[in-house]
């Protein structure tokens, strides 16, 4: 299915000697220190002057928007005499950008040996991974800062706001109401277990009572429609890949309780995670038995949970690995209900009953000619024997465990404590996130447009939209022009690629309606939610139900081409193949990615790279299967298809040969990360060329104070610094298994090793690590 993708970028150039050069940073450090001090003093005076006055509602790091720029003439070292001298920008915005870049760098490292260490060594040295984090990166820092803003606006109750916003604040307060959560203990969970047909391991005589009337179809439908848990069979509604103007029912293999199927087999660290997972299950069931005044019966609990783990292990074996699911055309099988039933009988499983029961929750009736799309054919073929092997008790224990697993965070501390060892084995962390951050994240992910409206009002300058739109036009134009360089693609395919690129629609910042006070759409979006400050667990169940049913209703609704696929308060960017649409939420439109107060070299190397990355997703190993209208269609000639695969194989091999010390020397999965690597490489290449074109057409950029770097060098340094970050070993191992992105370090090294322009810019001799003898290129 055409899923949304995340952000990334890439570029090219070739070079000269690898001898040690004079430091890029020498000579300007004293000036920079004085400027930073002056800027901070000026800010202090400004702040003191405004105390007591009403300040604008614009907050946070996106500041100095109206400042006057002041410039000092200076000729950077190493630039030919004939080249025009650039102006040095000394505004607070530029000084802060210079300080950030300087602090993040490690000038003792040779850029041609390890550019990631050169660009990020200072950042890595200064930042220790917080106890609550499994990874800590520039992205995480920006998210932390964004959450501080959200905390302030969610806790602000001085004035009555619109209903959607008030509901978000009520949900936040219920999450923060820890005294009530502790007082209620496990009772909210025990109450809901009765609704779902009981958890056999945590009750007596299930087999002889509730179990006698148990039906798999109805249980799966209940989990799907009321709790948004698509267990055993993943049924969901989405745009039809072959006709993006309509929605259709999809049937696919499900997710599992642990992040990757690989954790269910093999030894080493996988065994440790498995053992911790089993103990987690046993501990939760034991607590619930105690609270229900039942005997501990540790033998029964252990036996039941071992059976659950065995069942889930068989399900894991039945699933197809992600690296074998990249060809969406091969995955897609549309059929009627009769064919579905005849092909996948599952020992009497009634597909029509299951699907109709799910849809009945939103009062939708199946049509006689209703079609479904089956993605998970190999899984469904294997599922029949699994269902036949395990008892109703074990299957029900598993279904309810998946609901319980999802809701542990909504319960009292004693339940959270049961997952400590599991989280340590999986993420390397033993300390829970501070409560307010957990609650901010929860509310933002469940009420993204309500929270987004608060964030945009507080921290997003509206004029950013037009500037980003101009950057999109520039990068897209370069993508189209660059098609002429591709010898592996014939003219017919290039023409269709050009048409698709020019048809990509963009969404920037936020949907307009979330700020329109007279537009009731935002309030109507959450009209079915009614929260109580004392009922956090029940509030979370409401969100699950409303989310599930909002999705199910789409089956009979027209596809809205203007629908936003993500909220505004998000530090990320996305591409949707079904919509041929790129999205840049307000949360990512801030330094180091973007600011009107920093040189364009940084903007092109930041958000420009992200723009190129998302555009390139339309032509990666998944996006290439969709046409300009978002319909799955093979618009490629046989010649171009064959050569695309050959170009891609180069990248699969390149990234697959990176051995990651943090992940027990495991290699990056070149197959799983192919789409993101293609986008990274294409994104930085296009952004760099767009920057050079902008300058060639008369664009005047400024130098940053204290940094004797060319504009081109600043571009690449800012690109690399976007990815500064470090991992805990446990999470590194998990990332190798589950993340479709390469590790941060290899996102930088891999893309820049493939760019001749980078080697030229830093004068890297052929044969040095950053100027390899062979390079890969797709776009």
Curated annotation (Swiss-Prot):
Residues 515-560 form a coiled coil. Gene3D superfamilies: Collagenase (Catalytic Domain), Neutral endopeptidase , domain2. GO terms for molecular function: endopeptidase activity; metal ion binding; metalloendopeptidase activity. One of its GO terms (biological process) is protein processing. Residues 88-779 form the Peptidase M13 domain. The chain crosses the membrane at residues 28-48. Binds 1 zinc ion per subunit. It catalyses: Preferential cleavage of polypeptides between hydrophobic residues, particularly with Phe or Tyr at P1'. A peptide binds at residue 135. It is a single-pass type II membrane protein. Its cofactor is Zn(2+). Zn(2+) binds at residues 613, 617, 676. Glycans are attached at residues 177, 207, 350, 530, 657. Keywords: Coiled coil, Disulfide bond, Glycoprotein, Hydrolase, Membrane, Metal-binding, Metalloprotease, Protease, Secreted, Signal-anchor, Transmembrane, Transmembrane helix, Zinc. Disulfide bonds join 89-94, 112-764, 120-724, 175-439, 650-776. Pfam families: Peptidase_M13 (PF01431), Peptidase_M13_N (PF05649). Belongs to the peptidase M13 family. Metalloprotease involved in sperm function, possibly by modulating the processes of fertilization and early embryonic development. Degrades a broad variety of small peptides with a preference for peptides shorter than 3 kDa containing neutral bulky aliphatic or aromatic amino acid residues. Shares the same substrate specificity with MME and cleaves peptides at the same amide bond. This is Membrane metallo-endopeptidase-like 1. The gene is MMEL1.
């Amino acid at each position: 299915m055409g899923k949304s993708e995340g952000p990334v970028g890439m570029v090219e150039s070739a070079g000269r000697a690898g001898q040690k050069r004079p430091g890029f940073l020498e000579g300007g450090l004293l000036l920079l220190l004085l400027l930073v001090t002056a800027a901070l003093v000026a800010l202090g005076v400004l702040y003191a002057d405004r105390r007591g006055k009403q300040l604008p509602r614009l907050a946070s790091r996106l500041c100095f928007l109206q400042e006057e720029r002041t410039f000092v003439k200076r000729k950077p070292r190493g630039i030919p005499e004939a080249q025009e001298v650039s102006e040095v920008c000394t505004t607070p915005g530029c000084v802060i950008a210079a300080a950030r870049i300087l602090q993040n760098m490690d000038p003792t490292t040779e850029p041609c040996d390890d550019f990631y260490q050169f660009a990020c060594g200072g950042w890595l040295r200064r930042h220790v991974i917080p106890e609550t984090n499994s990874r800590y990166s520039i992205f995480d820092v920006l998210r932390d800062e964004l959450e501080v803003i959200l905390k302030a606006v969610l806790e602000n109750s001085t004035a009555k706001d619109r209903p959607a916003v008030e509901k978000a604040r009520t949900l936040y307060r219920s999450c923060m109401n820890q005294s009530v959560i502790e007082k209620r203990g496990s009772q909210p969970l025990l109450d809901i277990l009765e609704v779902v047909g009981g958890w056999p391991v945590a009750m007596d005589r299930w087999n002889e009572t509730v179990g006698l009337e148990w039906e798999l179809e109805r249980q799966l439908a209940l989990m799907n429609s009321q709790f948004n848990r698509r267990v055993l069979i993943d049924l969901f509604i989405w745009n039809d890949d072959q006709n993006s103007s309509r929605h259709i029912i999809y049937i696919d293999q499900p997710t599992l309780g642990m992040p990757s199927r690989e954790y269910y087999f093999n030894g080493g660290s996988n065994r440790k995670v498995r053992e911790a997972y089993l103990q987690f299950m046993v501990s939760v069931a034991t607590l619930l038995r105690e609270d229900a005044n039942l005997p501990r019966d540790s033998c029964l609990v252990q036996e039941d949970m071992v059976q659950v783990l065995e069942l889930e292990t068989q399900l894991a074996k039945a699933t197809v690995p992600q690296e074998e699911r990249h060809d969406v055309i091969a995955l897609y099988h549309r059929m009627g209900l009769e064919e579905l039933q005849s092909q996948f009988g599952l020992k009497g499983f009634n597909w029509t009953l299951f699907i109709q029961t799910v849809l009945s929750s939103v009062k939708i009736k199946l049509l006689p000619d209703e079609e479904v799309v089956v993605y998970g054919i190999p899984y469904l073929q294997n599922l029949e024997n699994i269902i036949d092997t395990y008892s109703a008790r074990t299957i029900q224990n598993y279904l309810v465990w998946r609901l319980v697993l999802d809701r542990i965070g909504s319960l009292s501390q004693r339940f959270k404590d049961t997952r400590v060892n599991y989280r340590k084995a999986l993420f390397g962390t033993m300390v829970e996130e501070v409560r307010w951050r957990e609650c901010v994240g929860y509310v933002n992910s469940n009420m993204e447009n309500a929270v987004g409206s608060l964030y945009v009002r507080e921290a997003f300058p509206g004029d950013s939209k037009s500037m980003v739109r101009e950057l999109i036009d520039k990068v897209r134009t370069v993508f189209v022009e660059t098609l002429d360089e591709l010898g592996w693609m014939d003219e017919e395919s290039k023409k269709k690629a050009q048409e698709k690129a020019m048809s990509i629609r963009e969404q920037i910042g936020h949907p307009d309606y979330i700020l329109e006070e007279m537009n009731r759409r935002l309030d109507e979006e959450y009209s079915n939610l009614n929260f109580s400050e004392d009922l956090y667990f029940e509030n979370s169940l409401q969100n699950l139900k409303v989310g599930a049913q909002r999705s199910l209703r789409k089956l009979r609704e027209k596809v809205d081409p203007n629908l936003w696929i993500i909220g505004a308060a998000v530090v990320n960017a996305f591409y949707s193949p079904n919509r041929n649409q790129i999205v840049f939420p307000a949360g990512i439109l801030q330094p180091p990615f973007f600011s009107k107060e920093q040189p364009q070299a940084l903007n092109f190397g930041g958000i420009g790279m992200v723009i190129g990355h998302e555009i390139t997703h339309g032509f990666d190993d998944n996006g290439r299967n969709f046409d300009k209208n978002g319909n799955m269609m093979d618009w490629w000639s046989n010649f171009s298809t064959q050569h695309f695969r050959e170009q891609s194989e180069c990248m699969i091999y390149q990234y697959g040969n990176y051995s990651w010390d943090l992940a027990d020397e495991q290699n990056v999965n070149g197959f799983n990360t192919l789409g993101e690597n293609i986008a990274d490489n294409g994104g930085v290449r296009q952004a760099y060329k767009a920057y050079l074109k902008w300058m060639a057409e008369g664009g005047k950029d400024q130098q940053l104070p204290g940094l004797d770097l060319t504009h081109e060098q600043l571009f690449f340094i800012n690109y690399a610094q976007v990815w500064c970050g470090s991992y805990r070993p446990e999470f590194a191992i998990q990332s190798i298994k589950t993340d479709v992105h390469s590790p941060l370090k290899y996102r930088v090294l891999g893309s820049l090793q493939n760019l001749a322009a980078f080697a030229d810019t830093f004068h890297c001799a052929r044969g040095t690590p950053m100027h390899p003898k062979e390079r890969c290129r797709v776009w």
